[in-house]
From Swiss-Prot:
It is found in: Cytoplasm. Transmembrane segments: none annotated. A type II topoisomerase that negatively supercoils closed circular double-stranded (ds) DNA in an ATP-dependent manner to modulate DNA topology and maintain chromosomes in an underwound state. Negative supercoiling favors strand separation, and DNA replication, transcription, recombination and repair, all of which involve strand separation. Also able to catalyze the interconversion of other topological isomers of dsDNA rings, including catenanes and knotted rings. Type II topoisomerases break and join 2 DNA strands simultaneously in an ATP-dependent manner. Heterotetramer, composed of two GyrA and two GyrB chains. In the heterotetramer, GyrA contains the active site tyrosine that forms a transient covalent intermediate with DNA, while GyrB binds cofactors and catalyzes ATP hydrolysis. Gene3D superfamilies: 3.30.1360.40, DNA gyrase/topoisomerase IV, subunit A, C-terminal, Topoisomerase II, domain 5, Topoisomerase, domain 3. InterPro entries: GyrA, GyrA/parC_rep, Gyrase/topoIV_suA_C, Topo_IIA-like_dom_sf, Topo_IIA_A/C_ab, Topo_IIA_A_a_sf, Topo_IIA_dom_A, Type_II_DNA_Topoisomerases. Residues 858-878 are annotated as: Disordered. PROSITE patterns: TOPO_IIA. This is DNA gyrase subunit A. The gene is gyrA. GO terms for biological process: DNA topological change; DNA-templated DNA replication. A motif (GyrA-box) lies at residues 560-566.
Amino acid sequence: MSDLAREITPVNIEEELKSSYLDYAMSVIVGRALPDVRDGLKPVHRRVLYAMSVLGNDWNKPYKKSARVVGDVIGKYHPHGDSAVYETIVRMAQPFSLRYMLVDGQGNFGSIDGDSAAAMRYTEIRMSKIAHELLADLEKETVDFVPNYDGTEQIPDVMPTRIPNLLVNGSSGIAVGMATNIPPHNLTEVVNGCLAYIDDENISLEGLMEHIKGPDFPTAAIINGRRGIEEAYRTGRGKIYIRARAEVEADAKTGRETIIVHEIPYQVNKARLIEKIAELVKDKRIEGISALRDESDKDGMRIVIEIKRDAVGEVVLNNLYSQTQLQTSFGINMVALHQGQPKIMPLKDILVAFVRHRREVVTRRTIFELRKARDRAHILEGLAIALANIDPIIELIRRAASPAEAKASLIAQAWELGSVATMLERAGDDAARPEWLEPEFGIRDGRYYLTEQQAQAILDLRLQKLTGMEHEKLLDEYKELLAEIAELLYILNSPERLMEVIREELEAFKTQYSDERRTEITANTADINIEDLINQEDVVVTLSHQGYVKYQPLSDYEAQRRGGKGKSAARIKEEDFIDRLLVANTHDTILCFSSRGRLYWMKVYQLPEASRGARGRPIVNLLPLEADERITAILPVREYEEGRHIFMATASGTVKKTALTEFSRHVSGIIAVNLNEGDELIGVDLTDGSDEAMLFSAEGKVVRFSEQAVRSMGRTATGVRGINLQGEDRVVSLIIPRGEGDILTVTQNGFGKRTAVSEYPTKSRATKGVISIKVSERNGKVVGAVQVDAADQIMMITDAGTLVRTRVSEVSIVGRNTQGVTLIRTAEDEHVVGLQRVAEPVEDEELDGVVKVEGEVAEDDDAIDDIDGDDDIAEDDE
């Protein structure tokens, strides 16, 4: 024990950790996780293919047990577990993993549903035909060989591949402190890119991308957008979005829609995808799906998603794209080993490295073939000399006492050149001369001196070779070798010819293995201005109390006489009702203010378009709302102009003014106003800094004051008092009056009135205000107020989902302190909950006759009777 203790050497643990971890990290980076830029293979892939090659497990020979290959790999080349090696083999044999499979498998090698492959003792493999292109010319000293892990075997340091495999099949791996994720590409496109680079070494990225369009995945699908592709090709890093190929089919008889998915994104597990969709439907996070099934078979993939009758297929599909792996992102990180060091490789750098590798391989192959050709020519040269001097040589051999004496005599004597002189004169005296040949051998002083190898070949010559026909064959072979040597020398001495050879081989390779692109590349909102494709039109945007949002063309609604029954604006549940309604243009931005005082952005055209009877789509599926957060106010904005403000009012009477430019950066969820407990936003509007504001309360009060009484504040401020409310009273409407016009006020029970703006006096901020309309049992509380002109129309909506549109001109102008007239007939327990002004009314020829309603027809006189009989119009009285 004491002897052992004396052998212990103290070391600094910090230094030892640094050194050991660095050794481990470099071992993982260089020897395990990252591919070589030249052949696109990691060490384990290289060792598997080499072991199969040594084993003779070729594409045109019988399959061999996977376990046999795995045993050879871990026994000779890869000192790791058999499971890691077998998993590598399995992946190289899966048509959904590699764009061009390198292993031809027989048996169960797993599925796109995530099923595991059968054990290695059950499956059989052999190299695929294209895999041989990675090992082509390996025996011709084209690459360096290095010792295996125990020094008993030699393995290639890199494959002499004819395939730009790093791009063709891609690669992924996680090393220490770095990772790589290179997508597969179409072989034809990549080869065309290589050829374009060979033709013009200064080709731009744009020029290369004319040939290499983008990744081409084995599972096909669709790449959304080219920007991520270009960024990755330019810098080596980028992100692309892969979307499943799906189509919405409609039944001709029932009209019900069905989503059919034919292709899914790369590396997505189909079974888990279907489970996720089912889970989202069960949790009601995705609406509108009635059935889901997998009808995939040997003929291809087919996932069927049946849509409910009242749902819109495109909306459901977009929801699936956003919440499931029907759309995924692929982060491209093109890291590979370049000259033994990890490096981020843009597209052109990868092509340059591959072409440079091919140049080296072809050069080394040419040198090898030249050496072999010269060695063979050297022997044939000696045989030709023997045939030219056949009689003296036969006599010499007959006189020799032994083969050794005969060989020595052949070497010692000088011989006539014969026909060899003419051939060598054409090719050059040194053309076929091996580099190892000593000066005293070969042609010297017009005579020929044989080497030991030539003398032995002459002694081994069979008598039948002495016939005239065999003599001619020998000379013809020698001539062909001289021509081959001349061509090989031309390749070595001419860089242009060398690149021609590389080009010819790439062309031949492309002809043999080319195929069509599978993955479609489409433009998306990041590449084109989607607004250029959206028709500008005015639409009605509705948001229900339970958060269902939609828009529909304004033209869907026909103007009616006041007192009409109205048309249903939305199909809603009994416990739901329309909470917010506004008119906007499809190109406007909707600023969505939440109950928590946060602001979210959406373009109007990004909202779901639905029919008048449809519920729309939950806004929580469109905006990243937090738990218990709901949208309480929405405002359309076209441009973020300097000098303009957003003026906000809360139910408790607080007002706040913030510069519009502070909301121009579209980051969802930023704070718009700091709300007190129990308070909420009831209105927002745009101002120019010199406007006035009017706050209307549920108890019929109104205060009008100058906007300048409210200073501009930051987004996170709470605001100041706008009106002094009494008791449980709350603010229901905010109006920023424009011009003269009138104020139209509506109560819960469908009554309302029109009063000139000038009737409302301007007071100080934070006062109790004056009467806006009489609140009574007949009228109910105030629902809202809007500013109107005589040419306008108004929309009113009830908590039962009924909407009526009527002309403002049909509502009489009365004083401020009055009860008003009937604007909409409400059923028992039905109340008006929303009011909106509509400009530029649509002409309706039927309005001059009978009022058009759903379910019944009422004469005009019935609607007018209420004015003469029941309405109480009183003078202005504060």
